[in-house]
Amino acid sequence: MDILSEILTNAGWKADLLARTSLYKPWGFRFPCERSGGFHILSQGSCYGRIKGKLIHLEKGDILFVAKGLDHELVYSPNDKVVDIAKFRDMSEKQKRSEKLPLTTFVSVRYEVPDAIQHPFFLELPDYILVKSSDVLAHHPLNTTQVLISQELDSGIGSDLILQRLTDILLYYVIRHWLEIHPSSSPGWRNAFKDEKILSALEALHRKISYPWTLEKLSRAVGVSRASIANRFREVLGCTPMDYLAKLRMDKGKTLMAMENFTLEEIARTVGYSSAFAFSKAYKRIYGLSPRNSEQERLGA
């Protein structure tokens, strides 16, 4: 069980290819991100990202991930004028081919982030994550996934489903790379991934989400005392094991509801509740809305 992949899957982020283009200087794009985040992959040349006024130099093979809600820019040089990314097709079509001007090729992917309460792990992500190609081994999955994305796009018949899966894989490795090279001394999820007992407990809860867990059963599964596992959860994650389980079940239930293939009764049993009523009561306690009202809000009804 991979806890990070489970968290990302349950988050319900949906990828959308914004741009895949090659441009000659000068150029610049603005990326509005009120309800989205995303990343940029630089396949050729160099450019700059600008986030909250800070310039970030990007070179071939670099990946820049930007968190939800951060409007930002991508420019060839710091003084280039910018246009909204929605107009990138107009700009690319107007450019004339040149053998002299530097050429930059990049892929931009947007992730639409649901308005629902997200997993607390996402609150610990920085404004942006920069993955420098020079910091990644040649055969690292980050590089392999970039190649597969480029090949899928170059084929001209790229499947939306395949691109969605590949971008999800890339997002996973970008975040895992950040976790590996930026350890934290403060309490939080970044430490949970490195605490063997916490990780074992999380894996048990995720693997058997419908099991009638108690603190006693969880402590036996992990091989520590009830007091020890309870204290570790509070110190590292800021909640009790049972509070975490309740939120985990609701997140899973929310994901199943969005699929529209299950009745509320089926969802309740899948995530460990005896009835749709019990599930609905717990759901409203955590989200402040009943499952039905939550779905109506999601669909804009």
What kind of region is each of these model predictions?
Residues 38, 59, 158-166, 188, ...:
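Amphipathic alpha-helical recognition patches that constitute DNA-binding helices
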Residues 1-65, 70-97:
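Generic protein-terminus/edge-of-domain signal
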Residues 107-116, 124-189, 193-203, 228:
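An amphipathic alpha-helical interaction segment
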Residues 48, 55, 212, 261-262:
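Residue at a beta-strand N-cap/secondary-structure junction
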Residues 169, 173-179, 200, 204-251, ...:
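Basic/polar phosphate-binding segments, predominantly the helix-turn-helix DNA-binding elements
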Residues 3-10, 71-150, 180:
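A hydrophobic/aromatic-rich effector-binding and dimerization subdomain
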Residues 68, 78, 113, 152-156, ...:
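A general structural signal marking secondary-structure boundaries and capping sites
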Residues 43, 145-153, 202, 206-209, ...:
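Regular secondary-structure segments
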